[in-house]
Amino acid sequence: MLNNEYCKRVYDKVLARDPEQKEFHQAVLEVLEGLEPMVERHPEMEKAGLLERFVEPERVVTFRVPWTDDNGKVQVNRGYRVQFNSAIGPYKGGLRFHPTVNLSILKFLGFEQVLKNSLTGLPIGGGKGGSDFDPKGKSDAEVMRFCQSFMTELFKYIGPDTDVPAGDIGVGAREIGYLFGQYKRLRNEFTGVLTGKGLSYGGSLARTEATGYGLCYFADNMLKNAGRSFEGAKVAISGSGNVAIYACEKATALGAKVVTMSDSNGFVHDPNGIDLALVKQLKEVERKRIREYVTVRPEAEYHEGCSGVWQVPCDIALPCATQNELRLDGAKALVANGCYCVAEGANMPSTPDAIAYLQSHGILFAPAKASNAGGVATSGLEMSQNSLRLSWTFEEVDERLHNIMVNIYHSAAATAEKYGMKGNLVAGANIAGFEKIASAMMSQGIV
């Protein structure tokens, strides 16, 4: 609920302008609620129309993507790139290929990305893009033809100093390779225009692990500040993609026992601890569903549907699957089962009422824009390596990532305390990220 009149007017304009964009509304409301204390202290923002400009993308590109399937039939998908804010650097954000992709989802992701990128301390703005194309069930040749068609339009709007996309759901190393190859072919340039690249052509060590590792580094700092740790804790993780897999790996390395993982069909509960090598084989090599886990580990249980993952008793919950996966009923189950920490690995995985419930019950809560910033932080480090024409070791990148995540935690915590909301990392992260962007936007005039 908004109390500041200026914030209310800005939010009402967002609702009126794009009434159907529910995900975007949710993201804007959550951010404006967190920014109210700062807006109260800085009336000059209203005169400059700062919030109105902040919630409106600088540019939205929509385009058709025609491609031919293996049967020779022409297919047409829709492509997008939302270039949200470049006040502190070139647009930076992933590409998502999934049937559910629409403009509302990409605007919410791009909006969150602006603040997340600011929090890293790196000079990168925010954006997001993708398509309603579904790579699942497609041959490598079909995926290649789609990616080449997609890049044939997108290349006009991106560049190493303009907009640097990366991967997201449905866009992994294979897709990034095809996209990069087509960009290089069209521009006749070898530049760091994409991140998440293969190591043989400009990628960074530790990029694959970065979001999951960074999530655990952030959560570890939050836990230590509260006198707790991962050591001996039981952890519930949702998802089985990059974020979930490497969050599982790092949580285990920090002494925890991970007992759940999921995909879009259901989840597995392994009370003896998830066999991560098996999950990697199933998901990264064989591209199979998580249900196959129990055929190798019969002591584990498979359950249809994803929401039940939060009914499993745990100490720490790491939602790493997709937006709005952790709802109020899941939050209530976590609290009832003694969970004391929730750290978001996916983008906006918790609904507002779930977050409010967790916070009201004293649960340590890490918002995605802070806790899952490790991926884009390491993308920024990949951009730096590309610009310098060198490669850092895994340990060098991991150390820089760890330092960035520690700094993000301390920045969010200190900012929350500064504005009288000690412990509220949601508000702290929003304000800490916005302060830098607001300063840059005010300095650059009405643009």
Model-derived features: where do they sit?
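Adenosine-phosphate binding glycine-rich loop
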Residues: 2-27, 222, 335-447
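Glycine/serine-rich phosphate-binding loop and adjoining beta1-alpha1 elements at the start
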Residues: 98, 117-231
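Glycine-rich phosphate/diphosphate-binding loop of Rossmann-like nucleotide-binding domains
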Residues: 203-311
